[in-house]
Curated annotation (Swiss-Prot):
<dbReference type="GO" id="GO:0020037">
    <property type="term" value="F:heme binding"/>
</dbReference>
<keyword id="KW-0007">Acetylation</keyword>
<feature type="domain" description="Globin">
    <location>
        <begin position="3"/>
        <end position="147"/>
    </location>
</feature>
<feature type="modified residue" description="N6-acetyllysine">
    <location>
        <position position="83"/>
    </location>
</feature>
<dbReference type="GO" id="GO:0046872">
    <property type="term" value="F:metal ion binding"/>
</dbReference>
<keyword id="KW-0597">Phosphoprotein</keyword>
<dbReference type="InterPro" id="IPR000971">
    <property type="entry name" value="Globin"/>
</dbReference>
<dbReference type="GO" id="GO:0005344">
    <property type="term" value="F:oxygen carrier activity"/>
</dbReference>
<feature type="modified residue" description="N-acetylserine">
    <location>
        <position position="2"/>
    </location>
</feature>
<comment type="function">
    <text>Involved in oxygen transport from the lung to the various peripheral tissues.</text>
</comment>
<dbReference type="GO" id="GO:0005833">
    <property type="term" value="C:hemoglobin complex"/>
</dbReference>
<keyword id="KW-0479">Metal-binding</keyword>
<dbReference type="GO" id="GO:0031838">
    <property type="term" value="C:haptoglobin-hemoglobin complex"/>
</dbReference>
<dbReference type="InterPro" id="IPR012292">
    <property type="entry name" value="Globin/Proto"/>
</dbReference>
<feature type="binding site" description="distal binding residue">
    <location>
        <position position="64"/>
    </location>
    <ligand>
        <name>heme b</name>
    </ligand>
</feature>
<comment type="similarity">
    <text>Belongs to the globin family.</text>
</comment>
<keyword id="KW-0408">Iron</keyword>
Amino acid sequence: MSFLSAEEKNLVSGLWGKVNVDEVGGEALGRLLVVYPWTQRFFQSFGDLSSADAIMSNAKVKAHGKKVLNSFSDGLKNIDDLKGAFAKLSELHCDKLHVDPENFRLLGNVLVCVLAHHFGHEFNPQVQAAFQKVVAGVASALAHRYH
């Protein structure tokens, strides 16, 4: 049984098809690093993260944000099996990178804010509610290896 209704799946896929993954990915990761500065410790090799401007213009942040959102896109293709879709990434982030799984929830919430900013009125309460479910599901799937 899916955690999303058919209508919610349509809302998510309809909006996601319009997302510029390159732009939104970099912005979401950048905002995470600005708003939650302790997350920067995982990205020390990215160079200058000394200010919000430095983070938001950092090419490595943008590139990794794109990579993150491409993985998110791949997961959306398997929306009814997020744990399976994100199993390898969960293992990587748990066993090798030792990322606090709370960071997945934080990034999901930042992503929702970035989508709202980019899509304005199109990101209505129904779309937001559907995306909140999706990012919670993805965060749970990424944290699965930790349990």
